[in-house]
């Protein structure tokens, strides 16, 4: 493994790493010796205090029972409108190749964060549209969750994802957090499998947390 960071000019930063590995023995999920490599290249640009942009490319290759390679491209812009409002816009693309068969996918997302200075409340709204060929080209959705919970759900197929998170610090010791997620699938009539199977093409999820600090 080797990694580097380089700042060629003010407000520009280039990051990269290369990871080449080999597992001579069996491991979880792989019943034969395997090898692989992974590369990442990211360019960050911060033209002002209120705006930051980055472009990231990742390449992954695995040589095991069924060799494959995967390419991912992500672009994101974070813009602070004021001391209380911020925007995050992102676009993701993926290409997965296995046995000379290619599958692709993309996701475009927009988040709006609101955290007023003089009110102990903060909210975040997230909307994303996605279209991928199959499960292998699933794409993670970068959305906020309730306190102490980091949730990065992945989606595949064709649909729209909406998420709204909320936190209210009622008093210094007491706070309440909640999140409502809504996913619409345009390419299926059943969502999930086994015990999590849902009839229909809509899935909703709710998270809540009440915290009391002593």
Q: In which residue ranges do the predicted regions lie?
A:
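Exposed, low-structure sequence patches enriched in small/polar residues
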Residues: 1-214
């Amino acid at each position: 493994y080797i990694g580097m960071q380089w700042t060629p000019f003010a407000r520009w930063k280039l990051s990269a790493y290369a990871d080449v590995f080999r597992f001579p023995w069996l491991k979880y999920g792989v019943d034969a010796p395997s090898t692989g490599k992974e590369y990442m290249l990211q360019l960050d640009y911060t033209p002002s205090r209120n705006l930051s942009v980055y472009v990231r490319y990742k390449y992954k290759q695995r040589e095991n029972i069924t060799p494959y390679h995967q390419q991912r491209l992500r672009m994101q812009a974070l813009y602070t409108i004021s001391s209380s409002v911020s925007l995050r816009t992102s676009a993701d693309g993926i290409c997965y190749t296995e046995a000379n068969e290619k599958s692709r996918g993309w996701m475009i997302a927009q988040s709006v964060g609101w955290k007023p200075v003089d009110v102990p409340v903060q909210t975040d709204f997230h909307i994303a549209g996605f279209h991928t060929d199959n499960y292998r080209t699933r794409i993670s959705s970068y959305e906020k969750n309730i306190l102490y919970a980091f949730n990065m759900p992945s989606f595949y197929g064709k649909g729209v994802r909406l998420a709204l998170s909320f936190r209210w610090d009622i008093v210094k010791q007491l706070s309440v957090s909640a999140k409502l997620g809504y996913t619409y699938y345009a390419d299926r009539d059943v969502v999930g499998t086994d015990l999590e199977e849902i009839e229909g093409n809509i899935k909703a999820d709710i998270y809540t947390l009440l915290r009391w600090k002593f």
